[in-house]
Regions:
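Post-Walker A alpha-helix
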Residues: 2-6
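Helix-rich effector regions associated with P-loop NTPase G domains
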Residues: 9-190
Length: 190
């Protein structure tokens, strides 16, 4: 963001070195502006509840989008599941058939299946059809933990550091995320 601001103001490109690895800014960077004011880039805050802490360096691209995220809407019936690669899972337990909009990195492959047998499907296909993690990384990946929510209004279900799913109608849902990764709700932002 700061590089984009600097480019807009001065025309200079890539003034600040960026990294997809979290926590690599070591100290405050002070950028002077023509009017005598400054922009400050500060080290980010590392939150242990974010997905990045459970991924290999190669897989950080799934939580650090380089392009604008293209939301994908899925029309789900009750008792359907949406896998978020192998990183998480969304279960539509009950409610009327409705659209759920997923906001995740464009490279993360989402897979729809029936809720019945979804856990066995995950165990069988983690590391192959459901990636990341790949087959070599899956043994070190934390187990998924279920978080159940009853939604009554437009709500985002957020998997910390990965993305979110917008729910627009009344529904009982479950979000599965790696143990240690926070799952929270918020009023829908879009």
């Amino acid at each position: 963001l700061i590089n984009a601001i600097i480019q807009e103001i001065t025309g200079d490109q890539n003034v600040i070195t960026t990294s997809r690895f979290p926590g690599t800014t070591l100290d405050k960077i002070e950028i002077p502006l023509d009017d005598g004011s400054y922009i400050y880039d500060t080290p980010g805050i590392i939150h242990r509840h974010q997905m990045a802490h459970y991924l290999t360096a190669k897989n950080l691209k799934y939580v650090s989008p380089k392009k604008e995220i293209k939301p994908k809407t899925y029309q789900l019936n009750p008792e359907q599941t949406l896998f978020l690669g192998g990183l998480g899972r969304f279960d539509f337990i009950s409610g009327e058939k409705q659209g759920f909009t997923a906001f995740f990195d464009n490279e993360l492959k989402l897979h729809r299946t029936k809720l019945e047998g979804a856990s066995a499907f995950y165990d069988k296909h983690l590391g192959t059809l459901l990636t990341p993690p790949n087959s070599k990384e899956k043994e070190d990946f934390p187990k998924l933990v279920q978080h159940v929510f009853t939604i009554k209004d437009k709500t985002d279900l957020v998997i910390s550091g990965l993305g979110w799913i917008r729910v627009t109608g009344t529904a009982k849902v479950a979000v599965w995320a790696p143990e240690g990764v926070a799952v929270v709700t918020r009023k829908a932002i879009i």
